[in-house]
Amino acid sequence: MAGIKPGDIVARLSYGKDIFFKVKAVIITDQGQRTALLKGLDVRLSADAPLEDLELQPAEQVLFYRHQDIHRCNSYFRRARERQEARREAYLTWMDVAAGSEGTQRGAPGEGEGFFELPGRVLHVDGDAEYLDRCLHAYQQLRLPVRGFFVAEEEQAFRVPELLSRYTPDILVLTGHDGLTRQKGDMSSLDSYRHSKDFVAAIRAARRLRPSHDDLVIFAGACQSYYEALLEAGATFASSPARILIHAFDPLLVVERVAYTPIHETVTPQEIIKDTITGEGSIGGVEIKGKLRLGYPASPHLRFLSATSG
């Protein structure tokens, strides 16, 4: 369609207008075809499409699309917060029982006011500045301490060592956009993916400094990423086993589950997958110990939870 320009919201006619995209750029291919470079509005997908396959979306349709996505995401965030509170109560009860068996007294059962929580600290490196801003807001909603940085996928391997050394997180997120190339070809080749090779390089850079899954939990990937290669490089969790799309907030929901699982408990991939927006086939990984610790005593001067961008 003529008149489509960077910043427009469009949908692909050949895919039944199933996903809305933002136009990043319009280029002319070697074959002389005017083609739009696209990024998903709510999924972490990079794609391209000829202009004649695109339909510009009116403002009211975009508003409705965004409203539906916000409503869906809020239901997952609400469930995560409810799970946090239930885990907190269970953890305090467990400590009451442990204290009783040792002949000590922590306080009245279920009291817990003297304790404070230390969930796992997150370093979120994102190849999409808009998604990073949305994720930082969501991290605040989920009470997760995070440092966030916009770093293009191609540059992440070069920035990660310095960021890891500076912020020493418990959990590292390496994400942005990905997707199978239009030619696809051999799905066991990194060349068939737009950014999987960049995520692999970033994972390896991180693992040279922090080789243990127990020391540093890594989530890596985006839509249709080369799941097996990411795990082999050292990711704890990765996308996408079934080469399907993942939601922009799926990495964050994985992180929340790990960050708020107590250190004496193991969190499994099966548990994590059911908490993601996209669900089965989107994400997988290996079991890992949680990162939540309780501290004592609480102090009005302690301020652990923050979401900041670099």
Roles of regions detected by a PLM:
Residues A2-K5:
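Short, well-ordered loop/turn sites that connect or cap secondary structure elements
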Residues K17-I28:
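Short beta-strand-centered aromatic/proline hotspots
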Residues F21, G32-L37:
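Short aromatic-glycine-enriched beta-strand elements
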Residues L41-G103:
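Intrinsically disordered, low-complexity, charged/polar segments
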Residues L136-R147:
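Short helix-loop-beta junction
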Residues L164-H177, A235:
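Proline-aspartate-enriched helix->loop->beta-strand connector
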Residues F199-I246:
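Catalytic cores of nucleophile-dependent amide-cleaving enzymes
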Residues L245-G310:
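C-terminal functional extensions of proteins
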